Amino acid sequence: MRPISVIVPTYREAGSLPGLLDGLASIRADGHDLDVIIVDDNSKDGTVELVADRGEPWVRLITRISERGLSSAVIRGLEESRHDVLVVMDADGSHPTSSIPDMEQALAAGADFTLGSRYITGGSTEDGWGVLRWINSKVATLMARPFTKVLDPMSGFIGIERATWQRAAELDPIGYKIGLELIVKCRCTNVVEVPIHFSTRRHGESKLSLKVQWQYLVHIVRLARFKYPRLSSFIPFACVGASGMIVYAGLLALLDVMAGTMVDTWIRILVAVLLTMTWNFLWDRRLAFWDAGSRSIARQYAGFVVVCSIPVLVTFFVTWYYSDKIVLPLAGVIGSAIGSTLGLFFNWVVNRLVVFKRD
């Protein structure tokens, strides 16, 4: 096995580090050349003292004072590494150190990227995963499908050759999914998944949060802009349109409760349509057409309203048609679905080329 540099990003993982370092020490005891770079975000939980007390010369600690974030910590570790084979793994004990030789063998056999996979044949997770965590993982994997066909693109246990990561386009990761960033930016085409058993952490707290999930969505948008520059605005545009359907139905329900028979149905529908268009405009401007030229927001809004008027009219009349046959919110769902589907590609093309055109 060739010499390996193992990068371990940490934040408040002092309780987990001894087990991880013991596992890595056992690999060295088998005669494999391996060093470890721990990149810690100034945890102040005893990490510095723990590494110093162990006194292992093959373990190097880098403490970052002002920087934060797992992905940037990994990049710092890659920059500080010494060997040509690079492995990144979590400190919490979820990744088995015993799989590192298998990952190195995959790279030696010609893979340009390898990762420890829970979902390939032979991989597994511990019992006790809740339904929400399972759904979260599957949805995140589905969202990564336009960028890679691997079964576990969310894995944080990855291996890469130094020459491969150094050819990367400008790395701009956010959140925790540095592996997906490297697969896309390094243009990795031969990705090999190594089956692993993913263990539940024994110490510390999980870093998964709503903020992390939001960062993942932003990351997906960034990667789409990189890999599919001509079509990258369509994905967030479609997502905003889908959210607009929910907003539209919710507004109709709210107006139905607040106004009832005091306000004509067509007025309630019109108010809901205009508010939904404003919602879509604000989010499209931020997510889909972020690179638009320097036209004023007022002119962009006016143009957006005009362009969207055709599918909006369809939405309006379909909702009105069904409003006396079924409850208004359900009529809004039907109208919004038909109008949004008909107008999706038309709105995207015209808004991209005219309203939000690049300078």
Which ranges hold each PLM region?
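Short, well-formed alpha-helical segments that are part of the catalytic scaffolds
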Residues: 13-26
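Hydrophobic helical membrane-anchoring modules
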Residues: 1, 171-250, 284-310, 320, ...
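Conserved donor nucleotide-binding strand/loop of the catalytic core
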Residues: 34-35, 48-80
